[in-house]
């Protein structure tokens, strides 16, 4: 009986000594646009996807490709994106903003695939090339992937042949096809989106005030 009471008292003591409602002190910045690389943007976008009722799928390559670090773009740079898709895609800030828009259209995988191909082109180690080529296939080419990109049969045949001997440029045809799709299909809607218009209004407004 004494042992039972003793164990109960110890349990009560342990509970009383446990920390209360302590929360980690996670500070977060308030970004002026999506070009910031802080974690608050990632969480906000994930919540937006959950609220939309669409299940989110994290691919193996996407875990590497978080929001790219970059400096805030100048007003001239932001305005120039409307005239030149290539120029926007060459800047991390432009890609980050475009990626946020694609996420609202559930086509973020197109940009992620393009970025993964760019990353593969930089590799020289054969083992790393083989591993990254395999991950790209599993994440974006395989029909079993929830983030499969839209490619025609000819390009798929080329990819299947290239898998026998992976190289840094094995996805070049597929990358060009997806790049063209984003340019012709997604980019015009991006320029008319609230995401881009709000950013333009914010920088033009601040410029006129100064």
UniProtKB/Swiss-Prot annotation:
Q: How is it modified after translation?
A: N- and O-glycosylated in synapsomal membranes. Serine phosphorylated in synapsomal membranes.
Q: Which gene encodes it?
A: RGS17
GO CC terms in record: cytoplasm; membrane; neuron projection; nucleus; synapse
Location relative to the cell:
Membrane; Synapse, Synaptosome; Nucleus; Cytoplasm
Annotated disulfide bonds: none
The organism's superkingdom is given as Eukaryota
- Ubl conjugation as a keyword of this entry, yes or no, is yes
Q: Ranges for the RGS domain?
A: 84-200
Q: Does the keyword Nucleus apply?
A: yes
What Pfam family is a match for this entry? RGS
**How is the subunit organization of this protein annotated in UniProt?**
Interacts with GNAI1 and GNAQ. Interacts with GNAZ and GNAI2. Forms a complex with mu-opioid receptors and G(alpha)z/i2 subunits, including GNAZ and GNAI2; the formation of this complex results in mu-opioid receptor desensitization.
Extract the InterPro entries matched here: RGS (IPR016137), RGS_sf (IPR036305), RGS_subdomain_2 (IPR044926)
> What is the protein name given in its UniProt record?
Regulator of G-protein signaling 17
Naturally occurring in which organism (per UniProt): Gallus gallus (Chicken)
Q: Where is this region: Disordered?
A: 1-21
Per the entry, what this protein does is:
Regulates G protein-coupled receptor signaling cascades, including signaling via muscarinic acetylcholine receptor CHRM2 and dopamine receptor DRD2. Inhibits signal transduction by increasing the GTPase activity of G protein alpha subunits, thereby driving them into their inactive GDP-bound form. Binds selectively to GNAZ and GNAI2 subunits, accelerates their GTPase activity and regulates their signaling activities. Negatively regulates mu-opioid receptor-mediated activation of the G-proteins.
Which GO MF terms are attached to this record?
GTPase activator activity
Name the Gene Ontology biological process terms: negative regulation of signal transduction
Q: Which UniProt keywords apply?
A: Cytoplasm, Glycoprotein, GTPase activation, Membrane, Nucleus, Signal transduction inhibitor, Synapse, Synaptosome, Ubl conjugation
């Amino acid at each position: 009986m004494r042992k039972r009471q003793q164990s109960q008292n110890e349990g009560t003591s342990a509970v009383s000594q446990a920390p209360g409602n302590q929360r980690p002190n996670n500070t977060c910045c308030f970004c002026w646009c999506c070009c910031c690389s802080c974690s608050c943007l990632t969480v906000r976008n994930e919540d937006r996807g959950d609220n939309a009722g669409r299940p989110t799928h994290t691919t193996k390559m996407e875990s590497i490709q978080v929001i790219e670090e970059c400096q805030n773009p100048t007003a001239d740079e932001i305005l120039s994106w409307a005239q030149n898709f290539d120029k926007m895609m060459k800047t991390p800030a432009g890609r980050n903003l475009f990626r946020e828009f694609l996420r609202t259209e559930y086509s973020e995988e197109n940009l992620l695939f393009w970025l993964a191909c760019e990353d593969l082109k930089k590799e020289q180690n054969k083992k790393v090339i083989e591993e990254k080529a395999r991950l790209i296939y599993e994440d974006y080419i395989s029909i079993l992937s929830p983030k499969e990109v839209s490619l025609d049969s000819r390009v798929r045949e080329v990819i299947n042949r290239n898998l026998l001997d992976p190289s840094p440029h094995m996805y070049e045809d597929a990358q060009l096809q997806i790049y063209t799709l984003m340019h012709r299909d997604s980019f015009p809607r991006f320029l008319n989106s609230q995401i881009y218009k709000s950013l333009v209004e914010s920088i033009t407004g601040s410029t006129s005030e100064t």
